[in-house]
Amino acid sequence: MGSRDHLFKVLVVGDAAVGKTSLVQRYSQDSFSKHYKSTVGVDFALKVLQWSDSEMVRLQLWDIAGQERFTSMTRLYYRDASACVIMFDVTNATTFSNSQRWKQDLDSKLTLPSGEPVPCLLLANKSDLSPWAVSRDQIDRFSKENGFTGWTETSVKENKNINEAMRVLVEKMMNNSREDVMSLSTQGNYINLQAKPSSGWTCC
């Protein structure tokens, strides 16, 4: 039998300069640049995964500009997306609080065919920097209160938790595509991506 292809559109949103473009580059090309370049409107990348012996996953990554003036266009950008990543900078409390605005904007404009919200991960980026402007307890509570699938800390620079977090998101999309009602049911928990409980993300 031939390989079965799954195509998913994944949004990457959040305030400007939180690391969205760097995340997309790291995940799709395994590269990182120290030089900041502002996204204008939207940028795109493709990631292909051999999910199993018989299944191929193709991810269209939509890197949405974080500037306020572009938010009127988000309905167009969000259309037909299967999942979302919302990012903030752990050293910048404003980007954290604005994650709620991004989540509300997303939920008001995009749902799954079932009417449920699309899976959405909250990524606490730049975790290699200090001091953090928010605590893990604050993030955990915020994630649960705002209906995120889960959250974890990431460092695009150090390539920490990037592939692991995206794998969790792909698993959620694959489960949704199979209409598996017994699939991942986590709502907002910290997702433990590592063997040690202190450095990952809780799910399930």
UniProtKB/Swiss-Prot annotation:
Keyword Phosphoprotein: yes
Keyword Nucleotide-binding (UniProt): yes
A GO biological-process term: cell differentiation
Chief location: membrane
GO cellular component term of the entry, any: Golgi membrane
Modified residues (Phosphothreonine): 71
Binding site residues for GTP: 33-37, 39, 126, 156-157
GO MF term list: GTP binding; GTPase activity
Protein family per UniProt: Belongs to the small GTPase superfamily. Rab family.
Quaternary structure and partners: Interacts with LRRK2 (via the N-terminus); this interaction is direct and stimulates kinase activity.
Full protein name: Ras-related protein Rab-7L1
Organism, scientific name: Mus musculus
